[in-house]
């Protein structure tokens, strides 16, 4: 009798443990790849997840991670990847649906595959733009050196490490601002970011559609501000279609025969939107040029608050700057302001960088599309948040000062 009672108690203990600690009790399911039915989901809506798993028809645990690799939630279900007649991208059978109401705005991925964004419609101080479509397009270009029709599964891997580095920095240094996330595809819908004070771009945003560019310009012209940390920003024009669960990226006809961007063509300069382009090369530089140094030209500007030196070491390989006219005898770049039309540009700092046996200028610039528009701080350097620069306190200080400056003005 007593032995029977002991086994009953043991069974109850095991039952309580299983109910109390479901996370980790079931074996994690190994995923081959997967995708979701939306790039961006509004907080409180549900998202459908499609997964292809190594072991079929097995019950197990899927783990939800944020983009920084932290486990956020889990769900226990059976992975069944039999094809059926649904019109999603790969005809995977839906694995499960997930309600996002308890998630804060951010970038997430189930089993670290197929990232999606949870977004909020509430007014906020900062909206960070995640380069969903640009990840897809750049992954395809790196593989094939051309753009074909591709789909959402291509976005599962190879997220720009500089974007991850920026988010890690942001998490540790920015506590006082309300923050929202959107996809670059959401730039086609002005209502998704019109209520934010500052847009932040911190990655590779090479590809833009005309509506994305038009809405960005509309946002800046309304008096709102933006921080750009990118050397390839608004360079190539492309189009995309989202049909149910499939995303199609394709070249526009006007750039199908040319590797040169259309936004920087003679008739459609991106200078008028952001003041800078990656394509400004100069073949011969003064002998006193020092690569990997940044020279501050306006040390009284608020973004340099707390900095006492005029020169700082910045590792620079890929950069952008305004249209160059020449370089003076002191090695200071002179810009062709006429190409900016109504744009108002101030050079706050500049540096030289070398890549592919060419040398060119990069810098930090304050740009206004017109006298009544909002402000853009353009840090024209993809390497700003590389693993070396990230360790430098002055890189952190300048970035934080930029965010504060744009939120105050």
Regions from the language model: what does each represent?
Residues 15-29:
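Bacterial Sec-dependent signal peptides at the C-terminal "C-region" and cleavage site
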Residues 28-31, 36-46, 105-154, 173, ...:
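Extracellular ligand-binding/catalytic regions of CAZymes and related secreted enzymes
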Residues 56-67, 114-195:
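Aromatic-Pro/Gly-enriched surface loop or interdomain linker
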Residues 86-89, 96-98, 157-242, 385-388:
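Helical hinge/lid and interdomain linker segments adjacent to catalytic or ligand-binding clefts
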Residues 49, 65-72:
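Metallocofactor- and cofactor-centric catalytic cores in central/energy metabolism, strongly enriched
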Residues 210-308:
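A glycine-rich, often tryptophan-bearing local segment used as a flexible ligand/cofactor-contacting loop or short
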Residues 72-87:
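Solvent-exposed serine/threonine-rich low-complexity stretches and specific carbohydrate-binding patches
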Residues 40-43, 48-50, 83-114:
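Ligand-binding face of N-terminal immunoglobulin V-set domains in extracellular IgSF glycoproteins
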């Amino acid at each position: 009798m007593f032995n029977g009672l002991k086994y009953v108690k043991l069974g109850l203990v095991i039952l309580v443990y299983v109910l109390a600690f479901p996370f980790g009790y079931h074996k994690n399911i190994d995923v081959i790849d997967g995708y979701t039915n939306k790039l961006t989901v509004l907080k409180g809506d549900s998202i459908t997840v499609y997964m292809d798993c190594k072991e079929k028809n097995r019950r197990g645990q899927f783990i939800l991670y944020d983009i920084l690799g932290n486990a956020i939630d889990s769900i226990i279900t059976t992975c069944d990847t039999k094809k059926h007649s649904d019109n999603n991208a790969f005809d995977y059978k839906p694995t499960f649906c997930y309600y996002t109401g308890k998630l804060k705005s951010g970038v997430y991925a189930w089993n670290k595959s197929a990232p999606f964004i949870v977004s909020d419609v509430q007014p906020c101080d900062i909206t960070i733009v995640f380069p969903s479509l640009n990840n897809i397009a750049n992954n395809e270009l790196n593989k094939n050196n051309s753009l074909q029709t591709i789909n959402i599964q291509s976005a599962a891997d190879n997220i720009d490490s500089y974007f991850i580095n920026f988010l890690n920095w942001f998490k540790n240094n920015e506590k006082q601002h309300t923050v929202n996330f959107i996809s670059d595809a959401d730039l086609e819908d002005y209502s998704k970011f019109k209520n934010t004070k500052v847009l932040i771009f911190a990655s590779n945003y090479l590809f833009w559609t005309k509506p994305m560019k038009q809405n960005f310009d509309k946002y800046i012209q309304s008096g709102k501000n933006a921080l750009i940390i990118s050397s390839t920003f608004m360079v190539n024009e492309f189009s995309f279609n989202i049909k149910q669960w499939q995303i199609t990226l394709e070249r526009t006809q006007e750039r199908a025969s040319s590797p040169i961007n259309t936004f920087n063509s003679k008739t459609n300069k991106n200078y008028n939107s952001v003041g800078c382009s990656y394509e400004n090369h100069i073949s011969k530089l003064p002998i006193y040029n020092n690569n990997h140094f940044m020279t501050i030209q306006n040390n009284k500007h608020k973004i340099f608050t707390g900095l006492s030196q005029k020169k700082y070491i910045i590792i620079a390989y890929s950069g952008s700057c305004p249209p160059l006219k020449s370089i003076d005898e002191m090695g200071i770049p002179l810009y062709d302001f006429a190409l900016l039309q109504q744009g108002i540009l101030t050079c706050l700092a500049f540096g030289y960088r070398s890549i592919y046996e060419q040398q060119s200028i990069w810098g930090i610039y304050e740009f206004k599309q017109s006298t009544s528009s909002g402000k853009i701080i353009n840090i024209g350097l993809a390497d700003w948040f590389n693993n070396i620069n990230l360790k430098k306190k002055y890189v952190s200080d300048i970035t934080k000062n930029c965010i504060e400056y744009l939120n105050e003005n």
